[in-house]
Every structure is written in structure tokens, then in C-alpha cells.
């Protein structure tokens, strides 16, 4: 059986259940042109040309063609009166919607909370626009819950919003008004008047197999006594996340005027809103930072700091000189010498290698400007005074801490080409670049027991340890949610396109059906005219 037929019967059955077998007015139903919540307030109490007065007495609702009033019509067919009792008002009137009360309902005692989903704002009355909005929001929740629980064994369906269900129900009523006998849903309705309809009871439709199947699927997830959805199945729960029509944002917009006590689970989008666990990258970052800090405390990751401490014997003089003499800091940055010392320790090349011959003797090499390659008798700052000449280079006994390195002791097999490349690109660290070290990174590196380093050395250590950089992890944390969001949007758009294609096909079939009926009616009119002429 086609899923559209099941959906139509489901809408009829759910409407009959949740509206408490109320009367359906084609005039009030068609007055809502677009959707239950986006239209302007039109006279919803208009039935056959009569505008409702908003009072409890329905006897004044007479049609322009002098048809009987609605109360007499329903009473004659064995239904209850259209007057609204106080108990119904206490169960179902939504808060803030007293202005949109039905023209044939009792306006007294409007309660503010309603927990019973099966109770309606009117008892066997005609629904208004605001009430249609609430009713079809409940039908949408019930359908999506039934679909996700697997009660309807049809995998070709998708979650439906209240707007879709309302428009489909509106279309079925229009078909009944155009041709009641030709409509496949005529067996589920009873005509009360020209534009008044009522759905048949369960006892009248107990022999209909599809009606019984839909009723069983509804009662598996819905309790008519309490008016609450019993359970939310998990078999198709994931489809609610990727569908635009069943998304929580749509349902939230539909339920703007709903009552406070509505217990549907789909109206709350907090449990469906997340596309995966987006906190995973942050947790990984925190965990990795904790592990690095722990290793720094235990001395397991102090290789670079030990090498740097060999060339830093007087950190207090280094810090004072850096602050008191900004000119010296501009001429010769201590981070430059530390980076050079670090790279020279890792650089391996034979003494006779031509790759080093000429490089350290050219005017553009680091040996120029009074900075000798041997570093033993180097005048680190010839322009500075004698009290600042030996900062960060003199040990406690007055000798230089740097020693002349023999290039013959370097291993040619462990040559680091990347180190040579970085040596060629060494530049002076400007003051604008130094504050880039964040407080978190400084606290992470300075957490060791023996890290008596200043801010400049902290910046140097961050530069010399690219393995501890959090850049790749931060990039991954930024890219992953974006990718998930784009995938979800693409999936939603794809399903929306498929749904629009289905609706277009249904409208095309309906157009062909109406065209066929029009041709038949024209043929009938022609034959009647011919008979009259004869």
C-alpha cells in the first residue's frame, strides 16, 4: 500500500482522536491559506456566510441561504451540542489565546494549563486558526513518534511537520467538497451540510483494515486517557536529526501558542540538536596539555630546557639588562643567540664539507657584526657599555659559557636539513611578536620546579618546541564542527528536494484528476444541452 494513503488515513484518525470528534468546517479550514501559524486573523467563525459573534449561544449562526443553525444540524445527526462546557475549558484552553476563541464556544473560565492532549478547546465545535495550529502540532508529534517507534512499517516515509499535515488535511477536505462520491476518503467522513463534515466513529469503521492498522499504530505510542506519548522508539530516531520538516526548530515555531502542559518530547529540541559530540576536541586539548605539564614536572620533557640552561648562567643579569637597555635588546636579541646555540648543537656536518665553507665567513653570515663563529672571544655588543657587555654570556667565574665547537666532531650522517633551513631564516624577534605567548602556554611550560625563566625565554621555548604546539589540534577542533554542520545541511537539503519532488508529483496527479473530472463534466453539460435542443 502506498505510504501517502497511510499518511492520509493517519491524519484523519489522529484528527478524530485529538479533536474529540469535532465538526470540520470547510469555511474555517480554508480561511487559513498558508499554514496554521503564519496567517492573519480572518473570521474563523464564518460558516455559510454567517460571522460568529463570540458568544456562547450558537443560535444566531444562520447562513445566507437560510440554512439551519449548526446546533440543530449536529443534534439531528445524533452528535452533541456545540456549546462548550466548563470542564472542557479547564482541560484544553491554551494560555494567551483567549482572543482567538471560537465563535461558537463558551468564553468563560479559560484555564491556562492543559495536560490532556486528547481534550480540545471546543467540545464538538468548529476549530479556529489558533486551535488548528495546536492540534496539528500534536498530530505532528504523534506521527513522528509513531514513525520513530517503527509502528508504521514503511521505510519510505519521513518525519512530517505540522504545516505539511495541515495542508494535506486541507487538501482532502477540498477534494470532498469538489466531489464527495469520487474521493477515496469519502468512506471516512459524514456530510452534515454543504461545508460541514464529521469523521465517522470507530464502531462505523471497525471493518476497515487500514483504519484498524493505523489505530493500532497510534495506540502503541499514545495513551488516550492521559494524552501523553508513551515512548520514543530508536529505530528511526536518527532521521529526526537530518530532516528539515521534523526538526526541532520547525516544531518550536509551530508551538509558539501551545499550552504549557504539553508533554510531547519532540517539541523540546535540546536532545536532538547536537550533531555529534562537539566537545571532543576540547577534551583532547585539555588532556594533552595536562600530560605535557605533568611530564615537565617529572623532568621527562626537559631535554630542550637543559640544553638552554647550559648557555644561561646568570638569568637575573640577563633579565635586568633586557629591561634597562632597550637599545641592546634591539641590536642583539638573546633569543637569537639561544636559537643559534640550539641549532648548532643539533647541526651535524664534516669540517671539510663545502656546505659550511664560505657560509660562516661571508659578511651576511651570523659571524659578522662582531659575533664570531667560535663564540669564545666574541664581543657580543661592541656598542654597549662594559657593564652590559657580558649579559647572558658570562658565568659566575667570569668566563664565557659558550665553547668553541669542533666541526669535525659533528656526525655527517645525522645532518638536519631543516635546521639549516631555519638558520637561514633567523630574524630578530620584534617587541610586537613577543606578547603573542598566551598565559596558558606560559603557565604550562613554567610549571616545572626548576624553570626560572623570564617571558622572553618562555617565548623562545615555545618557538623551539613545535611538537608541543596546539595549532593542529585547534585547527581540527574548528574544522570538525564546520564539516558536521555542512554535512547536516546538505543532508537536510537533499531530503527537502526529495520531498518537494514527491509533492510536485502528487500535485501533478491531482491536476490530471481534476482535469479529467472537468472534461467529464463538460461532456455531460454538452449532452444535456443537446437533449434540450432536441
Swiss-Prot record:
Keywords: Activator, Nucleus, Phosphoprotein, Transcription, Transcription regulation. The keyword Phosphoprotein applies. Disulfide bonds: none annotated. It comes from the Eukaryota. Residues 29-122, 230-333 are annotated as: Disordered. Residues 64-88, 238-252, 312-328 have a biased composition (Polar residues). GO terms for cellular component: nuclear envelope; nucleus; transcription regulator complex. GO terms for biological process: negative regulation of transcription by RNA polymerase II; positive regulation of antisense RNA transcription; positive regulation of ribosomal protein gene transcription by RNA polymerase II; positive regulation of transcription by RNA polymerase II; regulation of glycolytic process. GO terms for molecular function: RNA polymerase II-specific DNA-binding transcription factor binding; transcription coregulator activity. Residues 497-534 are annotated as: Leucine-zipper. Residues 30-43, 89-122, 253-279, 295-304 have a biased composition (Low complexity). It is found in: Nucleus. The keyword Ribosomal protein does not apply. Signal peptide: none annotated. The modification Phosphoserine is found at residues 151, 406, 409. A motif (Nuclear localization signal) lies at residues 281-288. Homodimer via the leucine-zipper domain. Forms a complex with a GCR1 homodimer. Transcriptional activator required for the expression of glycolytic genes. Enhances the CT box-dependent transcriptional activation of a RAP1-GCR1 complex. Required for GCR1 phosphorylation. This is Glycolytic genes transcriptional activator GCR2. It comes from Saccharomyces cerevisiae (strain ATCC 204508 / S288c). The gene is GCR2.
Amino acid at each position: 500500500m502506498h505510504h501517502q494513503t497511510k499518511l492520509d488515513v493517519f491524519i484523519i484518525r489522529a484528527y478524530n482522536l485529538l479533536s474529540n470528534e469535532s465538526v470540520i468546517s470547510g469555511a474555517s479550514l480554508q480561511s487559513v491559506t498558508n499554514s496554521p501559524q503564519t496567517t492573519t486573523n480572518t473570521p474563523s467563525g464564518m460558516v455559510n456566510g454567517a460571522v460568529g459573534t463570540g458568544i456562547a449561544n450558537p443560535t444566531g449562526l444562520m447562513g445566507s441561504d437560510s440554512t439551519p443553525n449548526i446546533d440543530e444540524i449536529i443534534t439531528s445527526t445524533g452528535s452533541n451540542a456545540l456549546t462548550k462546557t466548563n470542564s472542557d475549558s479547564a482541560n484544553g484552553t491554551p494560555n494567551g489565546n483567549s482572543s482567538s476563541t471560537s465563535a461558537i464556544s463558551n468564553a468563560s473560565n479559560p484555564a491556562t494549563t492543559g495536560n490532556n492532549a486528547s481534550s480540545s478547546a471546543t467540545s464538538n465545535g468548529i476549530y479556529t486558526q489558533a486551535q488548528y495550529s495546536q492540534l496539528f502540532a500534536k498530530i505532528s508529534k504523534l506521527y513522528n513518534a509513531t514513525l520513530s517507534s517503527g509502528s508504521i512499517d514503511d521505510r519510505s516515509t519521513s518525519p512530517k511537520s505540522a504545516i505539511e499535515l495541515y495542508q494535506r488535511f486541507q487538501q482532502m477536505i477540498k477534494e470532498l467538497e469538489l466531489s464527495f462520491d469520487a474521493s477515496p476518503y469519502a468512506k471516512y467522513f459524514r456530510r452534515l451540510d454543504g461545508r460541514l463534515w464529521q469523521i465517522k466513529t470507530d464502531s462505523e469503521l471497525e471493518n476497515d483494515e487500514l483504519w484498524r492498522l493505523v489505530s493500532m499504530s497510534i495506540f502503541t505510542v499514545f495513551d488516550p486517557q492521559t494524552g501523553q506519548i508513551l515512548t520514543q522508539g530508536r529505530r528511526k530516531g536518527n532521521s529526526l536529526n537530518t530532516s528539515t520538516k521534523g526538526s526541532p526548530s520547525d516544531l518550536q515555531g509551530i508551538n509558539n501558542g501551545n499550552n504549557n502542559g504539553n508533554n510531547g518530547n519532540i517539541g523540546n529540541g535540546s536532545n536532538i540538536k547536537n550533531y555529534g559530540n562537539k566537545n571532543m576536541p576540547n577534551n583532547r586539548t585539555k588532556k594533552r596539555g595536562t600530560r605535557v605539564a605533568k611530564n615537565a614536572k617529572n623532568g621527562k620533557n626537559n631535554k630542550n630546557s637543559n640544553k638552554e640552561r647550559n648557555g644561561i648562567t646568570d638569568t637575573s643579569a640577563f633579565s635586568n639588562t633586557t629591561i634597562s637597555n632597550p637599545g641592546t635588546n634591539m641590536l642583539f636579541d638573546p633569543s637569537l643567540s639561544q636559537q643559534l646555540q640550539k641549532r648548532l648543537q643539533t647541526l651535524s656536518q664534516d669540517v671539510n664539507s663545502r656546505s659550511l665553507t664560505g657560509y660562516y665567513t661571508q659578511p651576511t653570515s651570523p659571524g659578522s657584526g662582531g659575533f664570531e663563529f667560535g663564540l669564545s672571544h666574541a664581543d657580543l655588543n661592541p656598542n654597549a657599555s662594559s657593564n652590559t657587555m657580558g649579559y647572558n654570556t658570562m658565568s659566575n667565574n667570569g668566563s664565557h659559557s659558550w665553547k668553541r665547537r669542533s666541526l669535525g666532531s659533528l656526525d655527517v650522517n645525522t645532518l638536519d636539513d631543516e635546521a639549516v633551513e631555519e638558520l637561514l631564516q633567523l630574524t630578530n624577534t620584534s617587541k610586537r611578536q613577543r606578547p603573542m605567548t598566551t598565559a596558558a602556554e606560559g603557565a604550562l611550560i613554567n610549571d616545572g620546579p626548576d624553570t626560572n625563566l623570564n617571558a622572553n625565554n618562555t617565548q623562545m621555548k615555545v618557538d623551539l618546541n613545535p611538537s608541543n604546539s596546539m595549532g593542529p589540534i585547534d585547527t581540527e577542533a574548528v574544522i570538525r564542527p564546520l564539516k558536521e554542520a555542512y554535512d547536516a545541511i546538505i543532508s537536510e537539503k537533499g531530503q527537502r528536494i526529495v520531498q518537494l519532488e514527491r509533492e510536485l508529483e502528487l500535485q501533478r496527479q491531482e491536476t490530471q484528476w481534476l482535469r479529467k473530472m472537468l472534461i467529464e463534466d463538460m461532456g455531460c453539460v454538452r449532452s444535456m444541452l443537446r437533449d434540450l435542443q432536441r
